[in-house]
Amino acid sequence: MRFFFKTVKILILFLLLAFVGAGFYAGNAAYETMLTAPWEKILGVTKQTADLSRIHRREQKDGWQPVEIRSADGTKLRGTYIENSRSSDRTVILLHGLYQNRSMCIPYVDMYRDMGYNVLLIDQRGHGESGGSHTTWGLRETDDLDAWTEWLRGKDGGVKIGMHGISLGAAMALIYSGTESRLLYTSHAADDTP
């Protein structure tokens, strides 16, 4: 009988060690998968980097001005400037959402032009035609917005700048306009977060 209980104890210990080992293996495999996961597929979002055909058609057809500038760290930033047919000292910067590009903001262009604004559509860092491989969640995007506001002030020193963002763009607009020094440059920020 002692032999039976000793064998059962050893078997239970062996099974316990096997379960712990399997748990470590499964946990490590899950961790490795998370590090290399195609997040746009997992999250169900498609990266709209490649399809800028709507923007390019409007630039050619309607005379929208393609713009390229450099951020403070040298990253190439691309955008499209749309001057209002009426003379205006007000410009709104439209900021797209995560995994998108500036064409996401086209539906807002006519609304702002009807209200008398010039419009600047930008591709945020790591999106569309702008450089960078990913978003930095506001660490560098505020510097990028500094570069865009400087570009606008270079066109018109008295420009009044507003921002309208969608999702990630709304967060960037609010982060940017929430710092005291930058409030001097932005007249308003609109949040369009779902």
Feature map (PLM): residue ranges:
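Alpha/beta-hydrolase fold nucleophile elbow
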Residues: 156-167
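Alpha/beta-hydrolase active-site loop
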Residues: 136-156
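Conserved alpha/beta-hydrolase
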Residues: 112-131
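Short beta-strand element of the alpha/beta-hydrolase
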Residues: 89-96
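The serine-hydrolase catalytic nucleophile loop
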Residues: 98-111
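An N-terminal hydrophobic leader/cap segment in hydrolases
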Residues: 14, 18-69
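Conserved small/polar residues in nucleotide/adenosyl-binding loops
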Residues: 185-192
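Short glycine-enriched nucleophile-adjacent loop
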Residues: 170-181
